[in-house]
């Protein structure tokens, strides 16, 4: 039973490499180059949507004939302090709450005597441990999937849908009790391989239990909530074996970074789902350029102004 699920999981989780290279110019503008390499289906799914649109210069082998792996590159120039996209998804079939969100900013400040550069971003945590702990174990070791991980996931989807839905107070306890009874009896009696193969059937049974007693007026709301949660879970699972590498070159002298490594003037961050499956994965760096010549002239000008000010005061006396 476990071997069957393992084989299916290994077929599903194919490795994809995502690489971002950021080069920040002294004037605050920055260039971004994205490279992806891996299985075609995993490249075009929604776990990590790739950059698209007219602002990006794109080269791709996705349209070529069958191959073991494919490549996708995208390049774009950003203006000073222009925000980096929180997500590259621009469709309408997924809710924002389901997506992998990656806010990032490159901030440049010019103080005349010095300039500062800040690179700061994060991959928003997926909160796996608090939602479905057994999937956290699966992420850590896909070759040994824990017993009951799909039951736990389905239970979360149904109970959380029930919790978020605007169900009448006198109906909610009844539905909660019925769902709990079904989970503890019927669902628990299903082995992992059967549930894996017939997940749509058991999902429909669970949805019938929580939706049938509720008012038809909130059916669409409940469907939307369940879809949001289900897509969120699917995206998290699809992110298994997606590896990320961020490279960065900042102007000036490096002042702070939490990068994994530094080679020459290039900073590197390497991470995967295990690094953000619960909490945010944060990457940051800052640098500065100090203009000693401007500072000296600034001091001289300041002294001259002070002398002039004192002289004017003395003359008035």
Where are the predicted features?
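Short, intrinsically disordered low-complexity segments
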Residues: 1-2, 314
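Sec-dependent signal peptide recognition
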Residues: 2-8
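C-terminal motif of bacterial Sec signal peptides marking the signal peptidase cleavage site
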Residues: 12-14
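Start-of-domain marker
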Residues: 16-74
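Mature, soluble, non-transmembrane domains
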Residues: 59-303, 311
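C-terminal membrane-anchoring or membrane-association module
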Residues: 307-317
